[in-house]
Amino acid sequence: SQPWKAQYWLREVMERMYNANPDGYCGDEDNGQTSAWYVFSALGFYPVCPGTDQYVLGAPLFRSVRLHLENGKTVTIEAPENSRANRYVQKLTVDGVDYTRNYLTHGQLMNGSSLRFTMDNVPNKQRGAGEEDAPYSFSKTLKKKK
């Protein structure tokens, strides 16, 4: 598991492939999926595998965001050191507790959460590198069955 590589490439794609010009996003909009990917990625997480309740973590594009959910709960995302250079997650806390997993569950978000990302310009190659930190993977499931 090398989440810092995803953090690097997610930011590269968002900066290179999306902008405010008429041709500001790549390819076909595909019923809103391309722009939805960008919005999720800018928040710092995105759904990768339909059929699971997991959102894979990247790195937020904003320093502070609040999502006011329909159920009255709020998701707060803070990344005060975030910048163009500081694209790597050094540490993440969820509701004030250190969090090493590379995914959030739908339930965590819907119950309201406070995510605090500590960002830096150097990748933390230890954070989220454990096998237990990896999100769902069908190929991982197949390996266990063998």
Question: Where are these predicted regions, by residue range?
Answer:
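Non-catalytic C-terminal accessory modules of carbohydrate-active enzymes
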Residues: 1-146
